[in-house]
Amino acid sequence: MADFLGMMKQAAQLQSKMQEMQDALGNVEVEGISGGGLVVVRMTAKMDVKGVKIDPSLMKAEEREVLEDLLVTALGDARRKAEAAVQEKMQSLTGGLGLPPGLFGQ
């Protein structure tokens, strides 16, 4: 019975910490970069895009396809970095709770 109560207490702690982490992820920002910095996308770890910077040299009509490709690449780079930030936060959150490895994608 004591084990069950301990597990319930851990579950409540985890739920509280998960909510704190979700709130904190909105403040974690990453940058996705492509074309050696010609395109930079800023987003939060919650995947909200906060800004896009485009080098003026890409603003020509003949560079449209290059710009489109660089935007896709920069967004993908930012998404990967945001996912890594989430993983890092999740590992720090669940590390001391004695949960089985891989339970939350660790």
From Swiss-Prot:
Named from the GO MF annotations, one term is:
DNA binding
CC annotations in GO: bacterial nucleoid; cytosol
Tell me where in or outside the cell this protein is found. Answer: Cytoplasm, Nucleoid
Does the record bear DNA-binding in its keywords? Answer: yes
Per UniProt, which keywords does this protein have?
Cytoplasm, DNA-binding
Q: Which Gene3D superfamilies match?
A: Nucleoid-associated protein YbaB-like domain
Main location group:
cytoplasm
Give the matching Pfam families.
YbaB_DNA_bd (PF02575)
Checking InterPro entries in the record gives: YbaB-like_sf, YbaB/EbfC
Known HAMAP family for this protein?
DNA_YbaB_EbfC
- Subunit details for this protein? Homodimer.
Function of the molecule: Binds to DNA and alters its conformation. May be involved in regulation of gene expression, nucleoid organization and DNA protection.
Protein family per UniProt? Belongs to the YbaB/EbfC family.
**Record-linked NCBIfam families:** DNA_YbaB_EbfC
What name does the UniProt record give this protein?
Answer: Nucleoid-associated protein bll8115
Organism expressing this protein natively: Bradyrhizobium diazoefficiens (strain JCM 10833 / BCRC 13528 / IAM 13628 / NBRC 14792 / USDA 110)
